[in-house]
């Protein structure tokens, strides 16, 4: 290749000589100048076109292999981060909602069981308060009942109650004696029948059931009288009215009926106060005529029914709604006659 490059140079020199032969005659010689056409041989230098082998560098275009960097586009694998959305698993935090288990704290509510123990003791003084209210009401009732009641029957000796060897001659502490505040109390009873030797030898002071009528002396007993008094029957707590009648009249032992032999008097009356006073009047009158023979049972209506019914051993003997009206002297005699018949049957 270098040799060929050198050959054209002399030819060009020669051409220059021909140019110097500027004589017009020799000008046809320039026709030989086509020899320079041979200089086209350098066209062979087109072989350098092979130099586009640098174009072979176009394989370097493969260098866009860096364009393969978009292969990093798979980095949208970060788009998988939405899979991290499962972190809402912290939504399990509501599971601590069962922490309301502290609501079991109400279990201490059974502690009111301690409050149940005081009520058990409270009912003990309740009867004393109730009896105190009855005692306060008795003077008014006695003043109201005194004009309408007949004279008290003469007092009779108290019954003789033999005491068993196992019994305690002293009254039970749970039984309370209710004093009588009525101004109608009769004179002190006469001598009572003697008791059995065991009861006669029992030490201790005797109790008197008679009390003064002075309201200021309510709850205070008179000085004891040295006379034997029968002990109360255990298991029975009579009402205030019945105890008052017992203090006023002492029935004989023959009239002391057992509870199963007593005549049941059931009175159903209206809830008004006037009806309850009429019931007390009737009860006191019958107890004075039949001491220790009657067992009273009252049924007071909660409303004002205007009813006043008297049953003797389940038999209706008086009814206000049926036209009998209130119990007057004639109606009272009818009830007394029915009770006499029942006592004779027993």
Curated annotation (Swiss-Prot):
**What S-S linkages are listed for this chain?**
none
InterPro entries given for it? Selenoprotein_Rdx-typ, SelW_related, Thioredoxin-like_sf
Task: Give the residue spans that cross the bilayer.
Answer: none
Q: Where is this cross-link: Cysteinyl-selenocysteine (Cys-Sec)?
A: 270-273
Feature: compositional bias, Pro residues:
151-162
The record describes the protein's role as:
May be involved in a redox-related process.
Any one Gene Ontology BP term = response to selenium ion
Keywords per UniProt: Redox-active center, Selenocysteine, Ubl conjugation
Q: Which Pfam families match?
A: Rdx
What NCBIfam families does UniProt report for this protein, alphabetically? CXXU_selWTH
Provide the protein name. Answer: Selenoprotein V
Species per Swiss-Prot/TrEMBL record: Homo sapiens (Human)
What family does the entry list? Answer: Belongs to the SelWTH family.
The superkingdom listed in its UniProt entry is Eukaryota
User: What does its PTM field state?
Assistant: Truncated SELENOV proteins produced by failed UGA/Sec decoding are ubiquitinated by the CRL2(APPBP2) complex, which recognizes the glycine (Gly) at the C-terminus of truncated SELENOV proteins.
Q: List every stretch annotated Disordered.
A: 1-40, 151-206
Please name the Gene3D superfamilies in this protein's record.
Glutaredoxin
Tissue localization of expression is: Testis specific.
Q: Which GO terms describe its cellular component?
A: cytosol
The record's PANTHER family line, in alphabetical order, gives: SELENOPROTEIN W
């Amino acid at each position: 290749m270098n040799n060929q490059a050198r050959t054209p140079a002399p030819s060009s020199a020669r051409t220059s000589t021909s140019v110097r032969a500027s004589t017009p005659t020799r000008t046809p010689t320039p026709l030989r100048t086509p020899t320079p056409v041979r200089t086209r041989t350098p066209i062979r230098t087109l072989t350098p076109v092979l130099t586009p082998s640098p174009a072979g560098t176009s394989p370097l275009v493969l260098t866009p292999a860096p364009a393969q960097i978009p292969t990093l586009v798979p980095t949208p694998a970060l788009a998988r981060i939405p899979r991290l959305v499962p972190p809402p698993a912290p939504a399990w935090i509501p599971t601590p909602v069962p922490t309301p288990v502290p609501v079991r704290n109400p279990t201490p509510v059974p502690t009111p069981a301690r409050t149940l123990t005081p009520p058990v003791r409270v009912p003990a003084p309740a009867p004393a308060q109730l009896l105190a209210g009855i005692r306060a009401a008795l003077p008014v009732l006695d003043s109201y009942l005194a004009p309408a009641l007949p004279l008290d029957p003469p007092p009779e000796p108290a019954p003789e109650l033999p005491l068993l060897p196992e019994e305690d001659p002293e009254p039970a502490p749970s039984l309370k004696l209710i004093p009588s505040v009525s101004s109608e109390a009769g004179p002190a009873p006469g001598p009572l029948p003697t008791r059995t030797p065991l009861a006669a030898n029992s030490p201790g002071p005797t109790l008197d059931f008679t009390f003064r009528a002075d309201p200021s002396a309510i709850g205070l007993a008179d000085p004891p009288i040295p006379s034997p008094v029968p002990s109360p029957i255990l298991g029975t707590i009579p009402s205030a009215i019945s105890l008052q009648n017992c203090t006023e009249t002492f029935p004989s032992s023959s009239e002391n009926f057992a509870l199963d032999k007593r005549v049941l008097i059931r009175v159903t009356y209206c809830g008004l106060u006037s009806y309850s006073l009429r019931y007390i009047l009737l009860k006191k009158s019958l107890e004075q005529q039949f001491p220790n023979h009657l067992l009273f049972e009252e049924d007071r209506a909660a409303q004002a029914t205007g009813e006043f019914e008297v049953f003797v051993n389940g038999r209706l003997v008086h009814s206000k709604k049926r036209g009998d009206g209130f119990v007057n002297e004639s109606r009272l005699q009818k009830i007394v006659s029915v009770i006499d018949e029942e006592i004779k049957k027993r």
